[in-house]
Amino acid sequence: MRQAIAEEVSRSRGVKVTSDEVVVVPGGKPIIFFAILALAEVGDEVIYPNPGFPIYESMIQYAGARAMPIRLQEEKDFRFDVDEMASLISDRTRLIILNSPQNPTGGVLSKQDFHDIAAAIGDRNIMVLSDEIYSRLVFEGEHYSIMSVPGFQERTILLDGFSKTYAMTGWRMGYGVMRSDLAAHITRLMTNSNSCTASFTQVAGIEAIRGDQSSVDRMRAEFRRRRDAFVAGLNRIKGFSCRMPKGAFYVFPNITKTGWKSKPLADALLEEAGVAALSGASFGEFGEGYLRFSVANSLENLNQALGRIDAWTKKNL
């Protein structure tokens, strides 16, 4: 399994990876947890995207480190200002978490963004945790990794997995790629907590990663079709304004013109319209004023959801 992953990451990121630089884990979260435990302690600082995957902040706080949010900006298609990130770096910064494509916004960092981030970090003793779990779900352009920036392979912990690319969520299979000395310590954390990733799921993972990839291409095309339809529909609804996400399978509309806070609106849409969305505030302080919808559903159901949201807004706004 580790050899298959090493071959795939070497090919897709344009770097040389060996099997002793790969740690296989049951899902992506253990890599987030172990990386933060390994690199940050009380008094240290970790910079992370906000709004972002809630586990980042909770894991940082669990380790006793200080969580330093970097705001994803709607006007920049939910990328962040690299100068703002640089201003957060201090002599206590141990780790910077990047996520592209992003959950919940669908934002994608550009190749230039990654090179600018690398330049801002410079020669400081700071590691990067690059969450690339949606790497195969980029709709415009090509996925790029900070691991591919010259000089940054040894400073990057790459997180990827099978849940999103191969729709294998329940199989619980993810992996981290990092320099071999750090991989040995992360493996020790894995061994003493989860023992191992189930062997039969690893066999399935090998088949997925080495097999025919046409299903991945078809799924990406279908997600793009659903994204296009759902964003267009939301932008026709009173109070909603939605940018076109460039990756993942979420849309993240701005709902400030509805006059509602995100949590009450999400609750009302669920209870009164039968449409499930997550409050943007669930993803951090800078997520207020937004909702997250998933397009991992049929186009028929997504169109039905749009109709229900539209009817609810006409009645309540």
Give the location of each predicted region.
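PLP-dependent class I/II
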Residues: 11-317
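Glycine-rich loop-to-alpha-helix module at the N-terminal edge of alpha/beta enzyme cores
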Residues: 4-7, 11-12
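Generic hydrophobic, aliphatic-rich segments that mediate packing or membrane embedding
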Residues: 1, 5, 28-31
